[in-house]
Amino acid sequence: METSNILDFETRTFYKTITIGRGRRQQLVNSSGRFCVAFRMEGTRSQLCYRIWKELIPDAVQRYKMIGERISRTQLEYFSGFRYVPSALRMKCDGSILPGIVMEWIEGKKLDAFMTEEWATLSDVQRLTFIRDFYYMCHLLRKNGIAHGDLSCMNILVTPERDIRLVDYDSLFVSEMGRNFYQTTGGAPAFQHPDRTNASYPMLTSLEDDNFSQLVIALSLWVAYFDPSVTQNYDDSNLLFLPGDISGETGSERLRNLKDSDGWKRAEKVATKFGHIPILMKGLESIQYSVNQVPSLLKFVNEEVIISADFYRLLDSADRNVSSMQPVPYCTACGQKFENDEFKFCTACGTKRHTYTVSSSFIPYRHEQSM
């Protein structure tokens, strides 16, 4: 991509493409998906992602207008701000003009790379914090009427600070869409119900699009929490399961493939250690039914549990109740994460930090002192 072919004035004027290699081996830093090619560009103070549509998404302008307004209004930290560019690039070969979007470049590792390269180096508390952050993201997306539509290792980045960021918004659902738009993709095969990946007819997009992928990722994280060695099998943009593990022509075949998989067997080995794991596995057994019957992760956990300092114990569930007053780890107004228990006001919006009473199931466990 030559800079002279970039039609967006601001990008062409203040940014340049980033290349790797030398001479004839020199090439642009880019990544490619089904619909877009994304180029990394560098300015004096920032970097951006210049995404060019190689295949136009149906109703792209309407979709991105709704998506942009929703992201701007909610200000969720998981998304990058962007703007739609109807005339983004002139093709050198034939002069045709392609649309695209300009967005902030997010620095981070894909989820599978983070798991294989860093997970084993984290403490138990750091792993638990990351899992809770994933659950909180799922909660906030649903609370704000958003489904990503293609949650997978390719589209979940982990920053150097271990914050979660989402990329590739072509498949996003926002509540303004209602039941008027079709899904743009079936998603990554190792994360999606077969009804989506093998759909023989267009499926309407909805708030439920992330249900199956959230269960897959949640189970993968918990299995890795108890058995960090499993992350060495998380490669090629897959986690606990491979595409063949989540496939089949009939419900019974799908369930059999899932339960015969190495990932399922790894989950069974640690299932007795934590009461939430069998619940997630039961949720994934919905693979034998239609995609409309897949439960949301949020059916099994609510906001009070996620923000609780007793997150682990509440999910593990036991018989004896213990009540305690706890400060919330996230601002209830804007969602900003408090760095430690000393902060009494949100540093982002100034809202006073709330506390709440937890009546939880108490089981002594290895994080009791460090949490």
Segment roles from a protein language model:
Residues 1-29, 62-63:
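Juxta-kinase regulatory segment immediately upstream of eukaryotic protein kinase catalytic domains
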Residues 24-28, 34-81:
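ATP-binding glycine-rich loop module of kinase domains
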Residues 180-196:
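Conserved activation segment of eukaryotic-like protein kinases, specifically the C-terminal portion
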Residues 138-159:
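Catalytic-loop of the protein kinase fold
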Residues 329, 348-360:
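Short Cys/His-rich micro-motifs in 6-15 aa windows
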Residues 223-325:
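Helical subdomain adjoining the active site within ATP-dependent kinase catalytic cores
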Residues 155-169:
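Conserved protein kinase catalytic/activation segment
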Residues 78-124:
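Conserved structural core of kinase catalytic domains
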